[in-house]
């Protein structure tokens, strides 16, 4: 039997003392768990009700689709996210739709989400020697507080986001692997594989954490044949649990799209209803090796668009890097001294040190994979908790001989991060608490009972409204994060839905007019007609419904039609005394005349945009998206293409080609005259530098030298 597998037997004189220590540790564990949950509940209450972009865009709708088959009547209703595995959002949907007050719903979610702090505590205990119980508990408590001091984690307590929930599966899986280092066994490996497989199935971005967990397996204190067998058991359990969770949804995706992971992996399965170019979010990826090396320190600064859309400064990664460098120097110094004056040490490595080394190596691999795949901090919550454990463990080891200095260092770092949380962090929008359900929606009988086909316009789909309309209604987002066109494979599906629902066709759009509470006609309709015209439709402003969103964005939604009287809820809220947003749902009818000049100008726009994409494929990807039309009465046609991988939008108008970055803002970048691109393809110098995309047209002389 391996020495690590042996069960220690305590002498009789030490047994009572060990029992007392065990009882004390158990009571402290309960206090830590209760404290973590209380903190999560307090944070959720202080932040308010989460009404962020993703909650309104697809979280609530995803939970709805997990329990209701929408494939026959909806089509990209919430954009491309409509077809991600929705089961993880089902609990939020059930709670929010139950009629419970929003505060109760958020409290339940926050309590469940606090489990990630429990797991961080348990993981920290595993990387400290058991012969130092006080230091072990103190370090674990500090690790929990450091795990909590994550702006992205704090922003999600009590929210609809699934990042924390799936991160709990990841941390639990890693915890079991670390425990297997102290006591190798089949059960730990199988359970870890199951947990990481479930996490990956529910949120594919967790695949990186499952892959890097294999590094931890290499640190098992067993012979190589046994390591390989344990690794195979881990992999089989992971694959089996992944398949079990994915299978029900994947069968539906395969039936409707020919891709069981649609829209992911479409380069492999090649469904004609989505681009075959891989979906990659380049927003937070480093643009150079220097930027990647600097990233731990960049994340410590209160800057936007580092690993989140909002400023989310986090000192843990800089601390971890500095502590790891100091630990390496200290180890080299001790090794040099030992070689000079001490006998050769034993080959046995303490189990806690081996566990910490495994955790550190696994984290380093995960960090590298994460930066190369997305760099999005929401996808790194599990590893952020593990980073807190590693960082605090290294600090405790560095200053083990000087506990007071260790306490000063920990307190200083905590104080600096607390200051960042207070003054440097931007928090998501949260609505104030009221004793009302999460979505307080009143729908007139007509909309609740008569099914219509709703066309949605815009990247923000506001799909949270869909479940409250007639059950057999259908929804299509024709112009969002993925543009749909009648001439492509998407067109056949849209045409079939139009035929089925005609003449019950509607368009749902946000009404930005200042006097929208007094007008039941259609808002500015040119952009909507531009989106509808390719499908042979136009807006009918004479037949509109009004959706009033009151008290924030939005704690209450009241829907009434032009022919109906407003509901009592709507009448009780004077528009002048409340903050109210409005949506209009207007009728859609077939077009009576087609603009003949539009097709000709579209061919010219497609020509120059195709040439632009071929000249700089790294910026404008995926290539060949749908070209959008925006009528301009003063300057003529305006054409645009949106590139989801880089979040750029290219405009062809006013004689010029230019692109904008809506997420980062700033002025438009001009990349040549339309006439020049029509005449011949142009050479470009393009890329991304310091987080900013650029493209410069190379002059003819420079182009000749370049050739």
List PLM regions with ranges:
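Signature aromatic-anchored transmembrane alpha helix within multi-pass, membrane-resident enzymes
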Residues: 194, 214-215, 236-239, 243, ...
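Extracytoplasmic catalytic/substrate-binding loops of multi-pass membrane glycan-assembly enzymes
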Residues: 48-62, 68-92, 99-103, 256-262, ...
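Perimembrane helix-loop-helix junctions
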Residues: 5, 12-14, 18-19, 209-242, ...
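Transmembrane-helix motifs of polytopic, lipid-linked glycan transferases
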Residues: 94-95, 103-132, 172, 329-335
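Membrane-interface transmembrane helices that cradle and orient dolichyl/undecaprenyl
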Residues: 132-134, 165, 171-189, 199, ...
